[in-house]
Regions:
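Short, conserved active-site loops that position catalytic residues or coordinate cofactors/metal ions
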Residues: 51-55, 86-93
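Short hinge/gating elements
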Residues: 56-58, 406-407
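Membrane-embedded transmembrane helical bundles of large multi-pass transporters/channels
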Residues: 1-54, 119, 143-403, 513-697
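Structured non-transmembrane domains adjacent to transmembrane bundles in polytopic membrane proteins
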Residues: 64-86, 93-178, 402-582, 604
Length: 697
């Protein structure tokens, strides 16, 4: 028997009513748990194989149709799947010319490293710099070697050993950059999963203040993580789902974050129903029916929003969007099946020491959220105008964004390859360590070489290699400027224009500079393509869920405003606190998709409850009751989600750290400003017209 009337069961979709009876049913709960145990036992070992299908090649992070990506594909023809990548050892003195002992050291290193060089290749150097303060060895290595990483480490060990006093030695070049990147990504997904799991556990303990209850959402999220890894592995292996190490790492954070959010919301509603129903199975059945539509709509919005990234040109964006959508769906399945089953098996005692007693009222009406609602009711228009003004001021900071990280700026701590690049830039033509690559028909090689040599910004051009059939040749083009500089990117544009004009050459220009240029342009294009689609999808979901046109438009406007506020606040943190010189090119798009999808998440939870309460008590009381009822749980969910993304901010890659900071700030802004003040005050000011054209009831 209920303490107050609730909407009849018939208001909920029949499929949802049927689903709700299974996980919380007297028999169904055992079937659900048995099914999950079988799935985990049978497929669990596949979760550990996800790393086997991750693609860490350069093309995994490039626009799929970019010219630089085509060059990387063409280069595979030169030695099968093997690629010659040079390691560059730099021996330098800051305030003096190199000595004979320094030259002898570099010469001895050349001899010691000769055994690492693949057949047909040779070590170049020691090459002195024009200022006489540095020497350089270029050691070609092959990615086809089983010991590629060990070979690079040997180069570093040999170069660093027995160096004369005052001689600085660093090994970088493309091989050094590749290995440093691999080391960063090596255990990224495992590290993120363990760190996120620890954060979620601590926050659940604080939220529930129970020695037992936290175990059930944590265990359910663990099931979701295993299922996510298994499904992602199978889709990658058999359906060509693109997965890179970065997306695999963020995937675990997303699953833990949204999975815990859904657990918090379901448990909060279950606790309410336990106050009204003596039978825990009936309480769970009703909790699923009444919270299910919001949770499913939320997960659907996030999953579809992330899936919109499949329209992006940049492969890493497509990867994160698609695997993220898989993770959200798996998290949803776990939270609406295994979690209710676990809670239905155990009963009320898991809430100890705060056990919900049958026949008593929940404390929502006496919480701080009820008092906040009362304050908003007095001056709703002033409240939302003030909130919009403050958020808009934050957003103004986003107008000063500097986009595009250089190679040296990609890491929070400088790896050796970055140090080597800095030394090279100080003493040699800046592009010498990482030249552009031109793939051309051999018959047109000389014409292309002549055209490339005449380009402003090109230091030198020399033939490098040809395919076994002799049809294709590569040219190494050293630029005047550092590979990641704006001047080098402009030179690549001029180089492309020049070589493309050579008839029947089919010339393609790639290399690091070309990759950076192509990625930046694709990121700008992706913004124009993906953002309108995401907004349209989210709007349609809100219209279907709330059966209104006004409310969805208002809610969408609030999350867009929140995104720009978060972007501005993040820019201040990046420049004033963290000393990041620029934002990663992909950050605006990734941040927008995550924050719009996750931000609308909390609006869905709030407004579905407001509509439910408004149908019973009228619009104004419904808004206040909805805020009071959901305030605590949505705040907890927001803190959990922000904390999980904060874990990403501790990663060594600046691009990931920036994503973690932006999403974390955005979620907190949505939680404490948009959902707490802006949306309720707008709903109170607009009144029942917010539900137009539908009627409550």
């Amino acid at each position: 028997m209920s303490a107050r009337p609730r909407p009849p069961a018939g208001r909920h979709p029949r499929a949802l009513r049927s689903l709700a009876t299974v996980p919380g049913g007297r028999r169904g709960k055992w079937l659900v748990l048995a099914a999950w145990l079988l799935i985990v036992m049978a497929l669990g070992p596949l979760a550990g194989k996800l790393g086997e299908v991750e693609d860490s090649s350069a093309n995994a992070f490039l626009p799929g149709k970019a010219e630089s990506a085509q060059v990387n594909t063409e280069l595979e023809k030169f030695r099968g799947q093997d690629e010659i990548i040079p390691a560059v050892a730099v021996y330098s003195r800051d305030d003096a010319r190199t000595t004979r002992a320094d030259a002898a050291k570099a010469g001895a290193d050349r001899t010691a490293l000769a055994s690492l060089v693949p057949e047909g290749q040779k070590i170049a150097g020691p090459l002195p710099s024009d200022d006489g303060k540095a020497l350089m060895l270029v050691v070609p290595l092959t990615t086809g070697s089983d010991d590629f990483t060990a070979d690079l480490e040997k180069v570093r060990d040999v170069a660093a050993a027995d160096a004369p006093s005052g001689l600085d030695v660093a090994v970088g070049g493309p091989a050094g950059s590749l290995i440093d990147s691999i080391e960063v990504f090596g255990d990224l997904d495992t590290t993120l999963m363990l760190a996120t799991g620890a954060v979620v556990t601590v926050l659940l303990l604080i939220t529930y203040r129970s020695p037992v209850l936290w175990l059930f959402p944590a265990l359910s999220v663990g099931f979701a993580a295993v299922l996510t890894q298994v499904v992602t592995y199978l889709l990658a292996k058999y359906a060509s789902l693109p997965v890179d190490p970065q997306s695999a790492g963020i995937l675990m954070v997303l699953v833990f974050g949204v999975g815990t959010d859904y657990a918090l919301l379901l448990i909060a509603r279950y606790r309410e129903e336990l106050h009204r129903h003596e039978d825990r199975h009936e309480a769970m059945r009703l909790a699923l029916r009444r919270s299910g539509p919001a949770v499913i709509a939320s997960a659907g919005t996030i999953a579809i929003g992330l899936a919109c990234l499949a329209l992006a040109d940049i492969n890493s964006s497509r990867s994160l969007g698609l695997v993220g959508a898989v993770g959200v769906v798996c998290a949803l399945l776990a939270m609406i099946t295994v979690l209710p089953a676990l809670l239905a098996v155990t009963g009320r005692w898991v809430f100890w020491p705060f056990v919900p007693r049958y026949g008593t009222e929940p404390r929502a009406a006496r919480t701080v959220w009820a008092r906040i609602g009362g304050l908003l009711q007095r001056r709703p228009r002033w409240s939302w105008l003030m909130t919009v003004g403050v958020t808009a001021v934050l957003a103004l900071s986003a107008t000063g964004l500097t986009m595009g990280l250089t190679n040296e700026e990609m890491y929070q701590d400088k790896p050796e390859s970055v140090v080597a690049q800095e030394k090279l830039s100080a003493h040699y033509p800046s592009g010498s360590s990482d030249p552009a690559t031109v793939v051309v028909r051999t018959a047109a090689r000389d014409e292309v070489r002549q055209a490339a040599s005449a380009v402003d910004g090109v230091e030198s051009v020399r033939p490098e290699d040809r395919t076994a059939d002799g049809r294709l040749t590569t040219l190494s083009v050293v630029l005047d400027d550092a590979p990641d500089s704006e001047a080098a990117k402009k030179a690549v544009d001029r180089l492309r224009d020049a070589v493309h004009q050579v008839e029947d050459a089919d010339a393609l220009v790639g290399g690091t500079t070309a990759e950076l240029l192509d990625t930046r342009r694709a990121a700008q294009s992706d913004l124009r393509t993906v953002i309108p689609v995401v907004l349209a999808v989210v709007l349609l979901v809100l219209i279907a869920l709330l059966r209104s046109l006004v409310a969805p438009l208002l809610l969408l406007a609030t999350v867009v405003l929140s995104f720009f506020g978060a972007l501005g606040a993040s820019h201040l943190i990046f420049t004033q606190l963290l000393d990041f010189p620029a934002m990663d090119n992909s950050l605006p798009l990734m941040g927008f998709v995550f924050l719009v999808a996750l931000g609308i998440d909390y609006n869905i939870f709030l407004m579905t409850r407001v509509r439910e309460e408004a149908a019973l008590h009228g619009h104004t009381k419904g808004v206040l009751s909805g805020l009071a009822s959901t305030g605590g749980v949505i705040t907890s969910a927001g803190i959990v989600l922000a904390a999980t993304f904060a874990v990403i901010a501790t990663m060594p890659l600046v691009s990931m750290a920036q994503l973690g900071v932006l999403v974390g700030i955005g979620v907190l802004l949505d939680t404490f400003v948009v959902r707490t003040v802006l949306v309720p005050s707008l709903a109170l000011d607009v009144g029942a017209r917010v539900w137009w054209p539908s009627r409550l009831g």
